[in-house]
């Protein structure tokens, strides 16, 4: 979702997925993206950049912030997940770590690479793990692991003053 309207906040809710906030200062646009692995895999970053460009924005004037989300040391995945990414592009193996017969996915690094591939070089990353920081963030995976029926959501918002 993007907007150039002043004094209207746009926001997204996440619970392990990556919240991404974007600003393009010259054309005065902001964007908010909810990027889980599926959305990232299907190109939500590229689609949002294209939408901003369609509205006169330039990649070189965009600044993105990838907010708190599940980090690679907490994001264990199955082999079929790894294979899905590897089959799409062999370079995707760079977003996985293998430890003690377990596979871990680096969602933040994957999203960052998509910004770079699409010309956005100014990227801030909040290096907070929603899964491991139990007192600070809600986490879908942590709630499921602890057998809770539901979980809270973290909100990320952006606005042009």
Label each region the model flagged:
Residues 1-161:
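Active-site microenvironment for binding and transforming phosphate-containing groups
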């Amino acid at each position: 979702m993007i907007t150039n309207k002043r004094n209207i906040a746009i926001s997204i809710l996440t619970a392990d997925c990556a919240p991404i906030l974007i600003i393009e200062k010259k054309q005065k646009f902001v964007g908010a993206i909810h990027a889980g692995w599926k959305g990232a895999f299907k190109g939500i970053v590229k689609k949002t950049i294209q939408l901003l460009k369609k509205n006169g924005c330039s990649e070189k004037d965009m600044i993105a912030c990838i907010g708190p989300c599940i980090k690679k040391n907490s994001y264990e995945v199955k082999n079929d997940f790894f294979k899905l990414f590897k089959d799409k592009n062999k370079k995707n193996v760079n977003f996985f770590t293998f430890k003690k017969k377990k596979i871990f996915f680096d969602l933040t690094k994957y999203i960052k690479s998509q910004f770079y591939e699409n010309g956005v070089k100014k990227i801030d990353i909040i290096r907070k793990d929603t899964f491991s920081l139990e007192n600070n963030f809600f986490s879908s995976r942590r709630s499921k692991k602890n057998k809770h029926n539901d979980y809270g959501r973290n909100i990320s918002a952006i606005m042009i003053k």
